[in-house]
Amino acid sequence: MEEGLQRCFVLHRRPYSESSLILDVFSEEYGRLSIISKGARSKRSNLKGVLQAFTPLLMKWSGKGSMRTLRQAETISLGIPLTGINLYSAMYINELLVRVVEQETPYPALFLDYLTALTELAQSTNPEPALRRFELALLSAMGYGVDFLHCAGSGEMVSPEMTYRYREQQGFMASIRHDPLMSFKGNELIAISERRFTTPEQLKAAKRFTRIALKPYLGGKPLKSRELFLPRTRSILK
């Protein structure tokens, strides 16, 4: 079966045989797919420079099962310009998708969230807000539902100045005891819910929450993208 042209991004690529590539692709309509591009590494290939990460693509493939065969690929536009810490941040996002998102499952809204995150990274000097927003969008797409605006114990709206302790499978409970990892201020929970961070403390709180929530999906295996980071970038994504 051959599909029509689909909007895609290459998340990861690796050499296969003497002249081919195996691509991990994130498509708007079909989600993550493994696609073999035969002859893409040969000197005469017209795909040289096309199958790159962070470049919006139109792709057509054929076949069924766990490995499709690329039939056509073309760029929609130039690659999204990412350098330095923002490039490392985008690599982190790609690895999150590879590790967390199951293949063959459509996530059209998450595809747009991914495009938005890359665009924000290209335009920002601080990648943290874009990273936190994408992590929260990813968790939402995975069905990780958390009510940030109501106390799980009383059902009342969270108070900006009160402290709440996060309990997995339950939500946020009002607490007078502070836990460095699991406690959050009400204003931090409101900021996370709105995906709008106005203070460094709110960003740090969002990072703590996404690390807690993503841990079951990532297990104990470290993210390889972090090994590439300079010491100053590790502080953002650790």
From Swiss-Prot:
Entry annotated with the keyword DNA repair: yes
InterPro entries: ARFGAP/RecO, DNA_rep/recomb_RecO_N, NA-bd_OB-fold, RecO, RecO_C
GO BP, sorted A to Z: DNA recombination; double-strand break repair
Protein keywords: DNA damage, DNA recombination, DNA repair
Coiled-coil segments: none
One CC-aspect GO term: bacterial nucleoid
Disulfide bonds: none
Function: Involved in DNA repair and RecF pathway recombination.
Sequence similarity: Belongs to the RecO family.
Name the UniProt record assigns to this protein: DNA repair protein RecO
